């Protein structure tokens, strides 16, 4: 008997669950009212409705250059709200998330790093109409002429290419420079190609499937005969950010030899983009917008832990928000009255931000969760992580969410799942949670031990 073994696919990968994998949107109805449990959110109705209004303002392009502050205690869903805003806006609107401490670097100034992220959050949609000739090559004849410089040699004056589609055929008389592109692509009769009328670039799509019965040593990609006319107009839409344009102009392309490539690899410092270069890019962008070729899309810059910024960054942020090209800035802070970095210790400010910036912000408050809401959040996370939790264990975890923190309660899920499997159970029980409590300390118990042992474990 012939043995047949099934080959298992080794490429399939388990999807990793991050802290905010369960967030799918703000969970609002058609009237903008928050549903109690929707889109991965539980509660926080006022904050979600406020964010829904902000999303509508962003979509109608009436929010650029304004800033929002998400203020609330740790573990109340500030980062989740910012992530939900980005998902409501969709993939076409740029969303740039950063943490306050990311801006401090030895290579680049903090204000330059802040401006770089500002430019990353502003998109440019460029619409271009291209005239294209597409079809199967039925004729390829270069026409020669006498060399104008004299001598016996001849030069190619033009090339005649016949293209065929399902609707008809066309004969094109092309420039000799296009013939060079045809030779580079190794185009022969029977190939399907397309030629861009504006640039003259030639692309070989593949071999026509009419020749699929031919035997060839080289593996060919056979494509069907193009439909429609030979001459077509295609509208191509490209989405880029202003930072992409800055980088493209800041790094001029060197030669293709080994020395220049090695020189680019061994550059010790990051290239700092100057204000002059940015203003030149802005001029070109404004010209494109005036011509109707491009459209500016203000995105979202999310700065988490905004209290980590210093007074210089805040001063720069004030100026950047008032510039003509600015994204929507969403800030998040879990501090109350605290000192601003880079100022005197005795001067305290709300949320760690200066008073003049606070005046420019729309503040959205997030509230702590109650036990019932924590229960729903834990059960949702358990479902996402393919864990079954008994009602007793769920009650115990929700108490941890109230007494300690929601994060601690959620972090106990995975180790409790391992302990239940070790014990031969399919579901997490209260015994597993109790064992996890002994093995893993929460912050309060850890602080108490440190106080009792006078700084030593």
From Swiss-Prot:
SUPFAM superfamilies: P-loop containing nucleoside triphosphate hydrolases (SSF52540). ATP binds at residues 72-79. It is an enzyme of class 3 (hydrolase). It catalyses: ATP + H2O = ADP + phosphate + H(+). One of its GO terms (biological process) is box C/D snoRNP assembly. Pfam families: TIP49, TIP49_C. It is found in: Nucleus. GO terms for molecular function: 3'-5' DNA helicase activity; 5'-3' DNA helicase activity; ATP binding; ATP hydrolysis activity. It comes from the Eukaryota. May form heterododecamers with RVB2. Component of the SWR1 chromatin remodeling complex, the INO80 chromatin remodeling complex, and of the R2TP complex. DNA helicase which participates in several chromatin remodeling complexes, including the SWR1 and the INO80 complexes. The SWR1 complex mediates the ATP-dependent exchange of histone H2A for the H2A variant HZT1 leading to transcriptional regulation of selected genes by chromatin remodeling. The INO80 complex remodels chromatin by shifting nucleosomes and is involved in DNA repair. Also involved in pre-rRNA processing. PANTHER family: RUVB-RELATED REPTIN AND PONTIN. Belongs to the RuvB family. This is RuvB-like helicase 1. The gene is RBV1.
């Amino acid at each position: 008997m012939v043995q047949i073994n099934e080959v298992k696919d080794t490429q399939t990968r388990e999807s990793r669950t991050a802290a905010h994998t369960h967030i799918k949107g703000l969970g609002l109805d058609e009237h903008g009212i928050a549903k109690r449990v929707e889109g991965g959110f539980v509660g926080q109705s006022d904050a979600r409705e406020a964010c829904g209004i902000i999303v509508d303002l962003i979509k109608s392009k009436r929010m650029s250059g304004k800033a929002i502050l998400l203020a609330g205690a740790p573990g109340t869903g500030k980062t989740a709200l910012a992530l939900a805003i980005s998902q409501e806006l969709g993939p076409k609107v740029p969303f740039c998330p950063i943490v306050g401490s990311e801006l401090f670097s030895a290579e680049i100034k903090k204000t330059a790093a802040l401006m770089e992220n500002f430019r990353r959050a502003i998109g440019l949609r460029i619409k271009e109409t291209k005239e294209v000739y597409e079809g199967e090559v039925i004729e390829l004849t270069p026409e020669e002429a006498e060399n104008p410089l004299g001598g016996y040699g001849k030069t190619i004056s033009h090339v005649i290419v016949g293209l065929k589609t399902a609707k008809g055929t066309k004969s094109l008389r092309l420039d000799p420079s296009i013939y060079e592109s045809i030779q580079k692509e190794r185009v022969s009769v029977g190939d399907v190609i397309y030629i861009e009328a504006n640039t003259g670039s030639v692309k070989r799509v593949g071999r026509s499937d009419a020749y699929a019965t031919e035997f060839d040593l080289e593996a060919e990609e056979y494509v069907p005969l193009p439909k429609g006319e030979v001459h077509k107009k295609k509208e191509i839409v490209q989405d880029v950010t202003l930072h992409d344009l800055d980088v493209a102009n800041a790094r001029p392309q060197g030669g293709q030899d080994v020395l220049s490539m090695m020189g680019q690899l061994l550059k010790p410092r990051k290239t700092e983009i100057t204000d002059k270069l940015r203003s030149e890019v802005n001029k070109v962008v404004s010209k494109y917008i005036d011509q109707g070729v491009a459209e500016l899309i203000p995105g979202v810059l999310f700065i988490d832990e905004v209290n980590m910024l210093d007074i210089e960054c805040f001063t720069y942020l004030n100026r950047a928000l008032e510039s003509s090209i600015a994204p929507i800035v969403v800030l998040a802070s879990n501090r109350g009255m605290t000192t601003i970095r880079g100022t005197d210790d005795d001067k305290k400010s709300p949320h760690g931000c200066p008073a003049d910036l606070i005046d420019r912000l729309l503040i959205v408050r997030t509230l702590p969760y109650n036990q019932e809401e924590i229960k729903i959040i834990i059960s949702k996370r358990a479902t996402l992580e393919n864990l079954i939790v008994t009602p007793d264990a769920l009650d115990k975890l929700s108490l941890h969410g109230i007494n300690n923190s929601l994060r601690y309660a959620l972090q106990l899920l995975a180790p409790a799942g391992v302990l239940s499997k070790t014990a031969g159970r399919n579901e997490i029980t209260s015994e597993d949670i109790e064992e996890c409590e002994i093995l893993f300390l929460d912050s309060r118990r850890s602080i108490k031990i440190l106080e009792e042992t006078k700084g030593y474990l």
